[in-house]
Amino acid sequence: MRDTSPFYITTAISYPNGKPHIGHAYELIATDAMARFQRLDGREVFFLTGTDEHGQKMQQTAKKEGISPQELAARNSAEFQNMARLLNASNDDFIRTTEQRHHEASQAIWMRMGEAGDLYKDSYAGWYSVRDEAYYQENETELRGDGVRYGPQGTPVEWVEEESYFFRLSAYQDKLLKHYEENPDFIGPAERRNEVISFVKSGLKDLSVSRTTFDWGIKVPNDPSHVMYVWVDALTNYVTATGCLTDPTGPRAKFWPANIHVIGKDIIRFHAVYWPAFLMSAGLPLPKRVFAHGFLLNKGEKMSKSLGNVVDPFNLVEHFGLDQIRYFFLREVSFGQDGSYSEEGIATRINSDLANGIGNLASRSLSMIVKNCDGQVPLCGPLTDEDKAMLAAADSLIGTAREEMGKQLIHRALAAIIAVVSETDRYFAGQEPWALKKTDPSRMATVLYVTAEVVRQVAILLQPFMPESAGKLLDLVAVPTDRRDFAHLGEAGRLVSGTPLEAPKPVFPRYVAPEA
């Protein structure tokens, strides 16, 4: 039975103290593919992305540049919004944590946690990483040969002492472990789930949730000398956008709890430990799933400004094409694991899967139809076992894709679609429609019909991953725009014989590297 309930999906909100890099683009592309998939499958989707604009790091970066944190946030948030447009992301909202609606929601969640008796004031002393915006215990840090102490993410930590509000995280250890046990799909993939459970079992200490040493943040209700620790503020964005706290009868309130938060593996602790504890305290339902993807490595190396190997998504898209880049990252990298990429790898994937694969299949079969079948979808005659097997493979793809996308295994959904393209290539070559043209024209027509029908279904299924290019493929087989959703896959949407087709234009040209 198809699920038609509302579907709420989020990316992590990006920290705009610098320009967007390919890691931000990767998360947005993957989340967009999942959102589009659910929309095409008939669900009402709310897809959120945005920027996390408060905190000490923003204040320090702004000071270095001689501008206010507001100016830095506005300038760089605009860059992230430009990236979303460039990547053809279908987000329904873009949240900025400096917005009034977010201040109201953050203060509402704070008040609820206070009313639950989970906030108290004390003084804090411990190791703090400005870059990670995280506190670490001494045993999580190491003093290196350069005389600097580093946290577990390899970022410098400093000793901080100040008055702070604390959240009674220690009171939620057993409740969290019970939730993980009763909801085995709450955290994915499995290695992240194991990592979180092991962290929680090792014992949770109460969490410092306010700061007094800087003021660029959301003021604590009734105590304006404190600003909220950035993670209380940042995580609340997911609730803010639905209005479920500030506008409980509003149009988006029904979307909470989120179906899935898509995040990077480096922030799993905040999303799978602190966030559910805050929500339990505030009496709000928990998200259904938190899925952490891996890092993108440039030729096997982690990208960093110091190595000078940070890749600008704008340049990559300009060089290879948008859908080509979307396809490469979603197909090449096992979603949930780290993935390595290189320009050579992108070029190879474009040429093998797209230009020589679906592009070539569509071009060859549709050119033959235009030339030999009066430019119309041919008549489908009696089907042989090979024809039936080919159509059955295409018809069953939606089941496989739903299953894999339901587990966030985007790469496997795409692999299944491309496997059917390869199978159709073999079918087409084996049937030799060019030879049948002389010996058995009606059989040629049936082979061409079957091939074009597979192209139709593959194109419908490729829409979440390559929206524009898949749309062009559907134009080639003259599928009306109101018959491009998943409800029209299989027999429900078969090509209609006699439908006029235009001569195909190549959708995926081969990539040829520019000469140095």
Swiss-Prot record:
Q: So what does this thing catalyse?
A: tRNA(Met) + L-methionine + ATP = L-methionyl-tRNA(Met) + AMP + diphosphate
The record ties this protein, via Pfam families, to:
Anticodon_3, tRNA-synt_1g
Motif 'KMSKS' region: which ranges? Answer: 302-306
Any one GO molecular function term: methionine-tRNA ligase activity
Q: Name one GO cellular component term.
A: cytoplasm
Q: What does this protein do?
A: Is required not only for elongation of protein synthesis but also for the initiation of all mRNA translation through initiator tRNA(fMet) aminoacylation.
HAMAP family for this protein: Met_tRNA_synth_type2
What family does the Swiss-Prot or TrEMBL record give for this protein?
A: Belongs to the class-I aminoacyl-tRNA synthetase family. MetG type 2B subfamily.
Q: What protein name does the entry list?
A: Methionine--tRNA ligase
Q: Which gene encodes it?
A: metG
